[in-house]
Amino acid sequence: MRDLLQYILLLCFVTQLSACNYKSKQADVIFHNAVVFTCDGLHDNTPKSLAIAVKDGRIVDIGAEYAIRNTYRSDELVDLKQAVVYPGFIDAHAHFLGYALTLSKVNLVGTKSYDEVLSRLETFALSNPDGWLTGRGWDQNDWQTSTYPTLTELDQLFPVRPVAIRRIDGHALLANSAALKIAGLDNVRYFSGGEMLSLEDGTPSGILIDAAAEYLLKVIPEPDDADKRRAMIIAEKNLFECGLTSVVDAGLNVADIRLIDSMHKSGDLSIRIVAMASGTYPNLDSTFNIGPWRTDRLIAESIKFYMDGSLGSRGAALVEPYSDRLEHTSFLFLDSTDYCNALLRANEDGFQVATHCIGDAANHSVLNYYHQVLGGVNDRRWRIEHAQVVNPDDLWMFGRASIIPSVQPTHATSDMYWAGERLGKSRIRHAYRYGDLMNTIGILPLGTDMPVEDIDPLKTFYAATIRKDVTGYPESGYMMDQALDRSSALLGMTIWSAIANNNDREVGSIEVGKWADLVVLDRNLLTAKPEDILATRILRTVVAGKTTFNASNGQH
């Protein structure tokens, strides 16, 4: 009898104790009834039916539905109805401000001929009659002729109004005579680090490449801060609809970085941005004087250099001549002494360095320069952006000095139609080697390079794994021996990008203590049929626990 009484008393005590603990903790929001992929280990993508408790923007607990809901109370319970939850997508290489500004210019993406380019310009000019006429997105490789356009037709349509339209990669542009005159480029001239093409009679063709293009762009009036603010607010909404919660802006001036910071502080901008400062003078000096810094939403600890141009405009620096232009290899943009001095200063001041390298000559040079500064294995996380054509003999250098290759998979599926002509049958096997690049260091951050490519990370995932364009071409995939498995592609869009951004302690996986940056999808990318990947719907995007996009009501 005494034992029974003791048992009853103990049971009452335990019950009372449990009642005291029931919903004893406060959360701001609880996301529940979800299939969660935490991405919290390099090879741990096992789905779990979990609930996530969030307070002050950070994840405070993750666990079984009953455990979280019995422990935490919250005024906001979000039932995700067994939808799939990943860490918020991270774009490891983009041009966010550049993309934003293209939204108010002539969109030339997808044009199938020069005539279509001219037609879009005429249409846009009717409703935008004043000032410079600018646009971006044409690609002569998508046209039947595959040759550069000239200013002849532009001059006929716009004899007085200045026109400058950039190629999709941003490394070349076409200008009419009015624009060339304003820039003082009436006659063909030599550019170090660039090229100005001519017609048969020796007069300018209107095509300016790399440094020559930059020279003309400097005379086009810059949008003011108010225009940039409006553009970025619109652009951010588009990114949230795609499930992006963080984006790298690869090459900004100090003033624009400060503008982004002010927008974060005012609440006009929510998306996390890794702002790589442009490594050109005088911006480089200003960046060194300020030093590396960060806030909860903005990281300004990286410097971006350009070592060469693009493959499409034949500006990528190759060791051997282009297969379709036998006298041409292009050139390295940067003086070796100046570049090495900048690397030494960046290393001393604690900056991350990222360098644009497309051609095998550029990749070889920068890998060697990095080695000279870094020495061996380290945690500086210096990056090579694009790593598009890499000699097999150079691959070992990535791992030896912990150099991170940062790639954009849709480049492979956009370039595959003509890249073989540029590089030849043998050398094309050295290009778009995503599998080999991943194996050099164990991670491979993925990005879009927007506005060069589409902003949609689902297209990044599809191109990385299926290696086809959006029409399903080629049927067997492009160079499938270099395709990523789906788990690696997901990690490349989440935790691996966070590692490359020096922000993996804060974002990139769903873990206690990290920011609650999430994306909710209607299907699992790891198991979806290949033909269904691009049909995936983003249902919700969450930044620091707050829903920034909700497909059910169009909420931003």
Specify the residue positions occupied by each region the protein language model found:
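Bacterial Sec-dependent N-terminal signal peptides
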Residues: 1-25
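Divalent metal-binding segments
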Residues: 21-32, 37-286, 305, 310-362, ...
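A generic structural signal for residues embedded in beta-strands
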Residues: 61-62, 135, 518-521, 550
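Non-cysteine beta-strand/loop elements that form the S-adenosyl-L-methionine
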Residues: 95, 297-315, 402-413
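Acidic (Asp/Glu)-rich catalytic clusters
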Residues: 263-267, 290-298, 375-377, 398-400
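Short, charged, surface-exposed secondary-structure boundary motifs
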Residues: 283-286, 415-419, 551-552
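His/Asp/Glu-enriched, well-ordered alpha-helical/loop segment
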Residues: 344-354, 361-382, 386-387, 392-396, ...
